[in-house]
């Protein structure tokens, strides 16, 4: 019988529900249990694909091409599993499906309501995950905060699941904040008490309360929370700010959270073997070198917009025993005149993915600086496209060369739409999305990084390199070092006369893991260390 764990949040959002869920998933997996994890988001968008990164952080892409919440990145990195489109459910998806069924006549003329139709659809998404994966445990994180009007159907659905499958097969974890009032020198449990009261008014009694805090939580405070929230003091789990996120599973294990979960769910499993994870955390906390990477983007004021890129850089750093210091460089403030001053202290330059025409010239200036001054450069998606534009302008001398996405009337459309994309009007879900193979050219830096000539990577883009310019580019020294297996689509370019200048059309950051860094990131950080 599959067991179900639901993680809710109270008091404030962005409290760490995703990290808690991912960390618990890691512990349970290391106890020999099969784990699947999913995120329910109460917003009405079908997915975050068309949302501004300022609104929602990065869009995380799964193997099957789903554009999902960034928490799925945490899940994949912590638990080391590959999720799919069923792992992220939104209000928009659920309502779309229910309306589609109503139009088909599936409800036999009945009045379609939030209860039971919306809640049944939500429950089906949970049970579908169990059917498709046959996992021992399904962990479902409910986005938002208890008390939000948008969350009510989700909370009602997970309340009903307890009746559907039995109390011994369901566990509720509530994550709350214990704020520290600096002026009073006190921590306050009242917000947690009120949040649990709100949750209980909706019919859900949490079995475990995870309290986020900056300061240690005393036993007296745990006893107080337990008394008012009707749980044992041992079921109040402290989650303090950590030096590294990857220490959270060890902190939860130390407080026996996984034991409490298994006892409640009436499961038996051996203790989690966490030696490798402990070694990883020890390594992360004791890095002996430092390397500075300039990350040039237009959303740098919200670092979550580049969360997976930053994590992949850190993973590569762990492998090189190096702490990654990221310079978050706003491309809107970079010009040809000031780029040398801005970049003078960086050991490597990375231009990540992005859309739209704002701040493009700042990125191109950074790429030119990296190429001319032999600074290691790594371009991802748009960072690859602009590398070819910069080369066309400044090496081939093609004046006004650009991407047709940015400048539709350009004479030299180095980057252009594929023919099959030209008549598409909708923005959502129409990109080249998900895992695709790429064939690597022998004797290139890309092959040196991967150690093989055939790889699979995740994509998220609409525009492609224009093959009309391929021969010109290669004759001038830009190597096309990877293509789609049929040779039609350019996947990686690099420079022959540069220590390390590699740019890829795909998003390699999505497959990086803390104990298994992605190959291009690993070699990029190595090149940056050599450039110190």
UniProtKB/Swiss-Prot annotation:
Q: Which UniProt keywords apply?
A: ATP-binding, Glutamine amidotransferase, Ligase, Magnesium, Metal-binding, Nucleotide-binding, Pyrimidine biosynthesis
Annotated active site: 381, 507, 509
Regulation of protein activity: Allosterically activated by GTP, when glutamine is the substrate; GTP has no effect on the reaction when ammonia is the substrate. The allosteric effector GTP functions by stabilizing the protein conformation that binds the tetrahedral intermediate(s) formed during glutamine hydrolysis. Inhibited by the product CTP, via allosteric rather than competitive inhibition.
Residues annotated for ATP binding in this entry: 14-19, 71
Q: Does the keyword Nucleotide-binding apply?
A: yes
Q: Which residues bind L-glutamine?
A: 54, 354, 382-385, 405, 462
Chain positions recorded as UTP binding sites: 13, 188-193, 224
Positions bound to Mg(2+): 71, 141
Binding positions (CTP): 13, 148-150, 188-193, 224
Q: In what residue span(s) does the Glutamine amidotransferase type-1 domain sit? A: 292-532
Q: Which reaction does it catalyse?
A: UTP + L-glutamine + ATP + H2O = CTP + L-glutamate + ADP + phosphate + 2 H(+); L-glutamine + H2O = L-glutamate + NH4(+); UTP + NH4(+) + ATP = CTP + ADP + phosphate + 2 H(+)
InterPro entries to which the protein is assigned, alphabetical:
Class_I_gatase-like, CTP_synthase, CTP_synthase_N, GATASE, GATase1_CTP_Synthase, P-loop_NTPase
Q: In which pathway does it act?
A: Pyrimidine metabolism; CTP biosynthesis via de novo pathway; CTP from UDP: step 2/2
**Ranges for region Amidoligase domain:** 1-267
Question: What's a Gene Ontology MF term here?
Answer: CTP synthase activity
Q: Which GO terms describe its cellular component?
A: cytosol
> Which EC number(s) does UniProt give?
6.3.4.2
Give the UniProt record's GO annotations in the biological process aspect.
'de novo' CTP biosynthetic process; pyrimidine nucleobase biosynthetic process
Listed Pfam families? CTP_synth_N, GATase
Which protein family is named in the record?
Answer: Belongs to the CTP synthase family.
**Additional info?**
CTPSs have evolved a hybrid strategy for distinguishing between UTP and CTP. The overlapping regions of the product feedback inhibitory and substrate sites recognize a common feature in both compounds, the triphosphate moiety. To differentiate isosteric substrate and product pyrimidine rings, an additional pocket far from the expected kinase/ligase catalytic site, specifically recognizes the cytosine and ribose portions of the product inhibitor.
NCBIfam families this protein is in?
PRK05380.1, PyrG
What is this protein's function? Catalyzes the ATP-dependent amination of UTP to CTP with either L-glutamine or ammonia as the source of nitrogen. Regulates intracellular CTP levels through interactions with the four ribonucleotide triphosphates.
On subunit structure and binding partners, the annotation says: Homotetramer.
This chain belongs to which protein, by name? CTP synthase
Q: Which organism is it from?
A: Listeria monocytogenes serotype 4b (strain F2365)
Gene symbol of the encoding locus: pyrG
């Amino acid at each position: 019988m599959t067991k179900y764990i639901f993680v809710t949040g109270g008091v404030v959002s962005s409290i760490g529900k995703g990290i808690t869920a991912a960390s618990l998933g890691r512990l349970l997996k290391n106890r020999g249990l099969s784990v699947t994890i999913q995120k329910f988001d109460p917003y009405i968008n079908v997915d975050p694909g068309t949302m501004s990164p300022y609104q929602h952080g990065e869009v995380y892409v799964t193997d099957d091409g789903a554009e999902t919440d960034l928490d799925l990145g945490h899940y994949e990195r912590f638990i080391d599993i590959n999720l799919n489109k069923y792992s992220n459910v939104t209000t928009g998806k659920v309502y779309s499906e229910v309306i589609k069924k109503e139009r088909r006549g599936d409800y036999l003329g009945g009045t379609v309501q939030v209860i039971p139709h919306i809640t049944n659809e939500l429950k089906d998404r949970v049970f579908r995950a169990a059917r498709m994966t046959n996992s021992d445990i399904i962990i479902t994180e409910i986005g938002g905060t208890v008390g939000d009007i948008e969350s009510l159907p989700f909370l009602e659905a997970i309340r009903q699941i307890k009746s559907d499958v039995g109390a011994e097969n369901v566990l509720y974890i509530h994550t709350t904040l214990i704020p520290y009032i600096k002026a009073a020198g006190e921590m306050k449990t009242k917000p947690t008490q009120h949040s649990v009261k709100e949750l209980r008014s909706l019919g859900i009694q949490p079995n475990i309360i995870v309290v986020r805090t900056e300061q240690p939580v005393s036993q007296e405070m745990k006893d107080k929370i337990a008394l008012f929230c009707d749980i044992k003091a041992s079921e109040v789990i402290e989650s303090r700010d950590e030096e590294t996120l990857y220490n959270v599973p060890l902190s939860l294990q130390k407080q026996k959270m996984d034991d409490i979960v298994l006892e409640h769910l009436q499961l038996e499993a051996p203790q989690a073997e966490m030696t490798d994870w402990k070694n990883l955390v020890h390594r992360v906390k004791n890095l002996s070198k430092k390397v500075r990477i300039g990350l040039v983007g237009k959303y740098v004021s919200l670092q979550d917009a580049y969360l997976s890129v930053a994590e992949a850089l850190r993973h590569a750093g762990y492998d090189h025993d190096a702490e990654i210091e990221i310079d978050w460089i706003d491309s809107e403030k970079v010009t040809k005149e000031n780029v040398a001053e801005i970049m003078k202290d960086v050991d490597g330059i990375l231009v990540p993915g992005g859309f739209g025409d704002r701040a493009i010239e700042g990125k191109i200036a950074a790429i030119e600086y990296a190429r001319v001054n032999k600074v290691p450069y790594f371009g991802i998606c748009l960072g690859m496209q602009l590398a070819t534009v910069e080369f066309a302008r400044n090496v081939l001398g093609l004046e006004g060369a650009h991407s047709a996405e940015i400048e539709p009337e350009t004479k030299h459309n180095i980057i252009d739409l594929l023919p099959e994309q030209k008549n598409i009007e909708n923005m959502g879900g129409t990109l080249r999305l998900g895992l695709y193979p790429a064939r690597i050219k022998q004797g290139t830096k890309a092959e040196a990084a991967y150690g093989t000539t055939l790889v699979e990577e995740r994509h998220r883009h609409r525009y492609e390199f224009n093959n009309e310019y391929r021969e010109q580019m290669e004759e001038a020294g830009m190597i096309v070092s990877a293509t789609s297996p049929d040779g039609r689509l350019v996947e990686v370019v690099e420079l022959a006369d540069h220590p390390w200048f590699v740019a890829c059309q795909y998003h390699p950051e999505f497959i990086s893991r803390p104990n298994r860094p992605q190959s291009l990131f690993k070699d990029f950080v190595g090149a940056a260390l050599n450039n110190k």
